[in-house]
Amino acid sequence: MQITSRFTIAVHALAFIDLFQDKQRVTCNALASSIQVNPVIIRTVLSKLKEAGIIDARQGSGGSRLARPLNEISLYDIYKAVDTVDETGLFHFHENPHPKCVVGGNIHKALDDKIQRVQDTMEDELRKITMADVVDDLTKEMNRRGQSV
């Protein structure tokens, strides 16, 4: 599969931004500490989220804020912003199966539409889930553990 960790890093970052944007400046270093990745990765992800109009981020230590309400940010929006799948789709099909082999010559006809259905289904599910859903579940878990921001 071609989905990278950028997707879950972006979801984590957006949840963090939502919970802390009114309490402190949300910097790349704060996000990197929470997510446990290099700040360079955070900057790359935030840049893509900013390009997609999901966050407002200021250069330097200006911090990041949400540009849209959580219920207007779907997981699909995030996926498309940070983990764009190229024209080959989610699954990269080996390019040159042997055309004279009984399997190689027919595998694309047998598998291509199924793979596309899997990708379409995944994308449809991502469209149904918003960051509001994620932060709601996150807050419930924090409350269950007696944690707060």
Q: Language-model features: where?
A:
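Basic amphipathic alpha-helical segments that dock to polyanions
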Residues: 45-50
